[in-house]
């Protein structure tokens, strides 16, 4: 496509992540959006685990069983003239590394908050990553169909705990059994709750911001209370400032109920009016790659094995940062300098996929991977080499020794470990002295998922022996003497062959530093 067509296509893209604490309703709101995009025919299937109707975004077997998202799914659909790429992030804290990387691939975030609980620990963590990146954050206060906290309390908490200004785009008229509707400040109307809407869903407000006096609702005390509260926020609240929203310093707040599909479409439509187009990306040498640059470039932010268990496949997820992707095009893998042809490409609806012929900056494409890619890789098609900024990686804190339960199944054991480690699901270390495999993770759940997937996807039962929490510290190979290793500081190498010590506690690390004052240890990964 020519420059004008490319720019027009890029301008329709909206790529965002949904962040929340577990159980705040993230999966349900995702389902409702897919419903509006005509992608799913039935929403509200998320809770119905016994019926076999699992959430579209929770495709992995363990996610279906436990009802939590443990990997980031990618879903694409068209709505209101925009092409939307939603990245669903794991809500569970043990999967922060996968989530961090996912948040590097989006241009904005939707924060879902349970109106009965307010800000919860995981929401706070994920918010801070978005804040660090300076991306716009839009808030959906969920579960209005149940009794929750006072809306003003919720806004105050967001401002105080997260340090971001709020602007309520609408205001609840009651909650729980007394929910009447939403007073929509932005669209200047009242959106009636399903039970209250007899034929009409939206009622216009007059120039004073009130309903026609002949409407029955005007006699309800909930309506009068809402007018008082709206008057208060009009006078004492923040003014809407689009520049602040774009800088991530103000969050537009929407109320609603994802479960009953109330206020979700209004949110989606309004969000799409303000959500940013694909942003420019910085390279490691401080160059800026614009989305409408002619040459294709993108980076791998996630690798997922066994999206189709029948084929033992691996998919590398690529965020396109500039130009146009065409199936069959030649690109260079920056890390190796190797040329490769991208024949097998796909786009997703969680577990269903279709071959993609073309895509542009802002889109997420999946590339079938035979082991070429690593997380953080840059691929580019132009003459000038491009290398995007490094993706964050975490030093594990928990460690387990892992062996195959059945020694006759070493082949599937090694294949499973290799693939799951390349995904970044766990880190792998090998003992210098014994050759034992040691897994490292940020949280316990990662080990559980690893064990489950080894058995389920690779037919390899594993024995895992806890080693407790350790501190990982890398050492320059030139300074290494294998005699430095002891029971308190185990010498291992990482998957790239770099040596490091696993210290059992801070005391062991201090003792080592005193004994070898010239040796420099780092916590890098």
Curated annotation (Swiss-Prot):
It comes from the Bacteria. GTP binds at residues 20-27, 88-92, 142-145. It is found in: Cytoplasm. CDD domains: RF3, RF3_II, RF3_III. One of its GO terms (biological process) is regulation of translational termination. Its main location: cytoplasm. Residues 11-279 form the tr-type G domain. GO terms for molecular function: GTP binding; GTPase activity; translation release factor activity, codon nonspecific; translation release factor activity, codon specific. InterPro entries: EF-G-like_DII (IPR053905), EFG_III/V (IPR035647), G_TR_CS (IPR031157), P-loop_NTPase (IPR027417), PrfC (IPR004548), RF3_C (IPR032090), RF3_dom_3_sf (IPR038467), RF3_GTP-bd (IPR041732). Keywords: Cytoplasm, GTP-binding, Nucleotide-binding, Protein biosynthesis. GO terms for cellular component: cytosol. Increases the formation of ribosomal termination complexes and stimulates activities of RF-1 and RF-2. It binds guanine nucleotides and has strong preference for UGA stop codons. It may interact directly with the ribosome. The stimulation of RF-1 and RF-2 is significantly reduced by GTP and GDP, but not by GMP. Belongs to the TRAFAC class translation factor GTPase superfamily. Classic translation factor GTPase family. PrfC subfamily. This is Peptide chain release factor 3.
């Amino acid at each position: 496509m020519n420059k004008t067509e490319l720019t027009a296509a890029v301008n329709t893209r909206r790529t965002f992540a949904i962040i929340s604490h577990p159980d705040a309703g993230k999966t349900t709101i995702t389902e409702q959006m897919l419903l509006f995009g005509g992608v799913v025919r039935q929403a509200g299937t998320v809770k119905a685990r016994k019926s076999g109707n699992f959430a579209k975004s929770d495709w992995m077997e363990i996610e279906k069983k436990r009802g939590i998202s443990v990997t980031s799914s990618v879903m694409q659909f068209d709505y209101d003239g925009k092409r939307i790429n939603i990245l669903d992030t794991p809500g569970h804290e043990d999967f922060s590394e996968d989530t961090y990387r996912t948040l590097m691939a989006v241009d904005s975030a939707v924060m879902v908050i349970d109106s009965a609980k307010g800000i919860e620990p995981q929401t706070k963590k994920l918010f801070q990553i978005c804040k660090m990146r300076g991306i716009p954050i839009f808030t959906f206060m969920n579960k209005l169909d149940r009794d929750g906290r006072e809306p003003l309390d919720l806004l105050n908490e967001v401002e105080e705990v997260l340090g971001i200004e709020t602007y309520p785009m609408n205001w609840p008229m009651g909650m729980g059994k007394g929910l009447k509707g939403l007073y929509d400040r932005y669209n200047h109307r009242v959106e009636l709750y399903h039970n209250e809407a007899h034929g009409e869903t939206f009622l216009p407000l007059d120039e004073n911001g009130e309903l026609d006096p002949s409407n029955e609702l005007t006699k309800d005390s909930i309506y009068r209370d809402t007018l008082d509260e709206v008057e208060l926020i009009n006078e004492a609240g923040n003014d809407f400032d689009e520049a602040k929203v774009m800088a991530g310093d103000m969050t537009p707040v929407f109320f609603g109920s994802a479960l009953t599909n109330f206020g979700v479409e209004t949110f989606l439509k309004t969000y799409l009016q303000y959500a940013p187009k694909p942003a420019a990306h910085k390279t490691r040498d401080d160059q800026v790659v614009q989305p409408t640059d002619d040459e294709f470039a993108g980076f791998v932010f996630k690798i997922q094995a066994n999206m189709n268990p029948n084929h033992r496949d691996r998919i590398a997820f690529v965020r396109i940062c500039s130009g146009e992707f065409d199936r069959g095009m030649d690109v260079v893998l920056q890390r190796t300098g190797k040329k490769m042809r991208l024949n097998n490409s796909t786009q997703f609806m969680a577990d269903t996929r279709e071959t993609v012929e073309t895509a542009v900056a802002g889109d997420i494409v999946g590339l079938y991977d035979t082991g070429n890619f690593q997380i953080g890789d840059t691929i580019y098609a132009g003459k000038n080499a491009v290398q995007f900024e490094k993706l964050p990686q975490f030093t594990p804190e928990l460690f387990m020794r892992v062996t195959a339960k059945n020694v006759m199944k070493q082949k599937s054991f090694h294949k499973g470990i290799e693939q799951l480690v390349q995904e970044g699901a766990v880190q792998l270390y090998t003992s210098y002295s014994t050759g034992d495999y040691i897994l490292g993770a940020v949280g316990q759940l990662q080990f559980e998922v690893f064990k489950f997937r080894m058995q389920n996807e690779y037919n390899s039962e594993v024995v895992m022996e806890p080693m407790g929490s350790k501190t990982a510290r890398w050492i320059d190979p030139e300074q290494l003497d294998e005699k430095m290793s002891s029971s308190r500081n185990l010498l291992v190498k990482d998957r790239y062959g770099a040596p490091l010590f696993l210290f059992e506690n801070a005391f062991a690390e201090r003792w080592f530093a005193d004994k070898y004052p010239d040796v420099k240890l780092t916590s890098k990964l």
